């Protein structure tokens, strides 16, 4: 009797019903020194790890330009790293420790790890510069991140935080501030770099609400640059073209009374 109701392959999706997964692509970032950082990008991803964003490129240029005082010998944490170019450039420029993180999705973390491995030959060994990769969800426990630091620095935290194109996620602003509070070293020279482009210009007021929230959380906010890029990342998107080409850069530091 059961055989009378055998549907066979009636409900099986036909071949080609689902679009094939996009293959990974590759992108290059040419450093001011002339060195080329080549990174792998995931084929597609809802968390945007498939792009080399303008803020990532400009962050890397800023890091390289200010490396002698900002990066060399320092401990650096990048959150929302995607392909990880700013982390890689930090390691190349002599950071003592660099921890590259993004959402703990296996594809994203594996892609970051491949990029870190591919850049190993560019990273100095004297003095040594270590580059680590791990998944991290904003606002969660930071002790696993601090575990990558040299033992004598774990209680203090990181000298530099890199936050490129993360403040677009408005509902995560509180978690971003929490992560800053728990990872940034409470010293005068410790700094969080917050760099972004308003790809959706009509949402810029919501994006900028991050900064008053950070001030309430104990940080000073200083705008350090506004750079107009040559090309739009998304040419057919709506909104003010000039804003969509502009990268804004801010430095956030602990208020004097909280160091």
Swiss-Prot record:
Its EC number is 2.1.1.-. S-adenosyl-L-methionine binds at residues 53, 80-82, 102, 138, 164. It is found in: Cytoplasm. It is an enzyme of class 2 (transferase). GO terms for molecular function: N-terminal protein N-methyltransferase activity; protein methyltransferase activity; protein-lysine N-methyltransferase activity. GO terms for cellular component: cytoplasm. GO terms for biological process: methylation. Keywords: Cytoplasm, Methyltransferase, S-adenosyl-L-methionine, Transferase. Its main location: cytoplasm. InterPro entries: EFM7, Methyltransf_16, SAM-dependent_MTases_sf. It holds the Pfam family Methyltransf_16. S-adenosyl-L-methionine-dependent protein methyltransferase that trimethylates the N-terminal glycine 'Gly-2' of elongation factor 1-alpha, before also catalyzing the mono- and dimethylation of 'Lys-3'. Belongs to the class I-like SAM-binding methyltransferase superfamily. EFM7 family. This is Protein N-terminal and lysine N-methyltransferase efm7.
């Amino acid at each position: 009797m059961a055989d009378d109701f055998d549907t066979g392959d009636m409900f099986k999706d036909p071949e080609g019903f689902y679009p094939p997964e996009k293959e990974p692509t590759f992108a290059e970032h040419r450093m001011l020194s002339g060195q080329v950082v080549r990174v792998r990008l995931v084929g597609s991803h809802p968390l945007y790890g498939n792009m080399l964003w303008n803020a990532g490129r400009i962050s890397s240029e800023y890091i390289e330009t200010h490396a002698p005082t900002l990066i060399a010998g320092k401990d650096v944490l990048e959150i929302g790293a995607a392909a990880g170019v700013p982390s890689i450039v930090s390691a190349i420029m002599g950071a003592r420790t660099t921890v590259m993180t993004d959402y703990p999705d296996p594809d994203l973390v594996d892609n970051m790890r491949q990029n870190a491995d591919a850049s190993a030959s560019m990273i100095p060994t004297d003095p040594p510069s270590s580059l680590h990769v791990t998944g991290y969800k904003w606002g969660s426990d930071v002790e696993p991140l601090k575990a990558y630091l040299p033992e004598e620095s774990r209680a203090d935290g990181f000298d530099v935080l890199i936050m490129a194109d993360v403040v677009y996620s408005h509902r995560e602003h509180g978690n971003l501030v929490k992560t800053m509070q728990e990872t940034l070293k409470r010293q005068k020279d410790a700094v969080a770099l917050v760099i972004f482009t308003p790809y959706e210009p009509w949402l810029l007021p919501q994006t900028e609400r991050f900064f008053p929230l950070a001030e309430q959380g104990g940080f000073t906010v200083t705008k350090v640059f506004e750079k107009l890029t040559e090309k739009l990342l998304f040419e057919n998107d709506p909104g003010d073209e000039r804003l969509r080409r502009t990268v804004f850069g801010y430095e956030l530091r602990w208020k004097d009374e909280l160091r």
